[in-house]
Amino acid sequence: MSRPRKRWRDVDGVFLLDKPQGMSSNDIMQKVKRLFQANKAGHTGALDPLATGMLPICLGEATKFSQFLLDADKRYLVTAKLGERTDTSDAEGQVVETREVHVETPQILTALEQFRGDILQVPTMFSALKHNGKPLYEYARQGITVEREARPITIFELNFIEYHAPFLTLEVHCSKGTYIRTLVDDLGEVLGCGAHVTMLRRTAVADYPVAEMIPINELQLLAESFPLSELDRLLLPTDTAVSKLPALHLDVEQSKAIGFGQRVKFANEQQLGGQVRLFSAENLFLGVALIDGNIIRPQRLITQSA
């Protein structure tokens, strides 16, 4: 007897997943999508299979705002093994160089200083960045090295946690586009012994609370035991994806015009500029707009239910 076909549905919000080790971000996102029976889903910045931790999954209308989380600051806890370099700069790769480790804590503290603040970083070949329409990791798997330009990133914090040779643990608060594997590889070169990542955990994306993260096995159990309405209670509101933007509340007429995608004039007593979150007179999240003087220009809007 064939199983009844799942009914996919419109469900909106952000699910804070505690990603397990060993799965790709896309595979785990698809699993979350199936458990919620959601029509649409998207993640907000891939974690390597080796990595664990916070992976916000946007469902439904929240996918329209996933770019804001891709662009958000992130925090990581990382353990590096000194003395070995690998082709992927993590423990999943092949060891390509081994060196003796004669490194003490004071040397590490000094070396860390040059990686704080605004720096340039050359992305790893084992990344999803594209060259001529093809991901770099595909070239890398063929043994081809492509010249990459250094990109500006910001390391807001780089904190020493502990060092028990050859293992070094650090805490990193960084801007978008930062490759922790590359950071560790570069640090290993400065220390003169090489290094690669053995453990990586993302501890924060934007301002999302760590306490709200849910492991996939827990979500699976809930999905097997409770109706979908109980799963929906785990979702954070869609507007949390853009919580960094200032809020602008509209009156009834302004809300109606924005709903039609029209530009709206307003007094702009708060002297707002740039992007804002829009809320209706009933305090419903409408989307994101650009403020240009006293004009509200809609950019990304929620599709309102009939």
Curated annotation (Swiss-Prot):
EC number: 5.4.99.25
Protein keywords: Isomerase, tRNA processing
BP-aspect Gene Ontology terms: mRNA pseudouridine synthesis; tRNA pseudouridine synthesis
Active site: D48
The keyword Kinase belongs to this UniProt entry's keyword annotation: no
MF terms (GO), sorted A to Z: RNA binding; tRNA pseudouridine(55) synthase activity
Transmembrane segments: none
Catalytic activity: uridine(55) in tRNA = pseudouridine(55) in tRNA
First and last residue of the signal peptide: none
CDD domains: PseudoU_synth_EcTruB, PUA_TruB_bacterial
NCBIfam families: TruB
PANTHER family with a match to the protein in the record: PSEUDOURIDYLATE SYNTHASE TRUB1, TRNA-PSEUDOURIDINE SYNTHASE
Family classification: Belongs to the pseudouridine synthase TruB family. Type 1 subfamily.
Known function: Responsible for synthesis of pseudouridine from uracil-55 in the psi GC loop of transfer RNAs.
Protein name as catalogued: tRNA pseudouridine synthase B
